[in-house]
């Protein structure tokens, strides 16, 4: 089952930004319980030039279905607001 998601932002605090961890909102998932079933799945983002960056969902973020995905190499800023595929 493939799910589309939107990249919301980097994981960050007031002073630090973790560029290899992204907050992703899967479409049609609106609760923490549904999002917890996605932990361990692969996340794929395709750049406009054709590069493919892969990450893994590591935990839930918040109560409305967002998740955190860790990538080996961080996503560029142009990925913010773009779609990813959750496999």
Swiss-Prot record:
SUPFAM superfamilies: Translation proteins
Family annotation (InterPro entries): Ribosomal_eL33 (IPR001780), Ribosomal_eL33_CS (IPR018266), Ribosomal_eL33_sf (IPR038661), Transl_B-barrel_sf (IPR009000)
Transmembrane parts of this sequence: none
Keyword Ribosomal protein included in the entry's annotation: yes
Family, as annotated: Belongs to the eukaryotic ribosomal protein eL33 family.
PANTHER family in UniProt: 60S RIBOSOMAL PROTEIN L35A
Protein name listed in UniProt: Large ribosomal subunit protein eL33
């Amino acid at each position: 089952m493939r799910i589309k998601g939107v990249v919301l932002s980097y994981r960050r605090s007031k002073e630090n930004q973790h560029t290899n961890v992204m907050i992703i909102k899967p479409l049609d998932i609106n609760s923490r319980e549904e999002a917890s079933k996605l932990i361990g799945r692969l996340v794929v983002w395709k750049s406009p030039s054709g590069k493919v960056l892969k990450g893994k969902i590591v935990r839930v973020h918040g109560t409305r279905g967002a998740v955190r995905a860790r990538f080996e190499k961080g996503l560029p800023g142009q990925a913010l607001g773009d779609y990813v595929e959750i496999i």
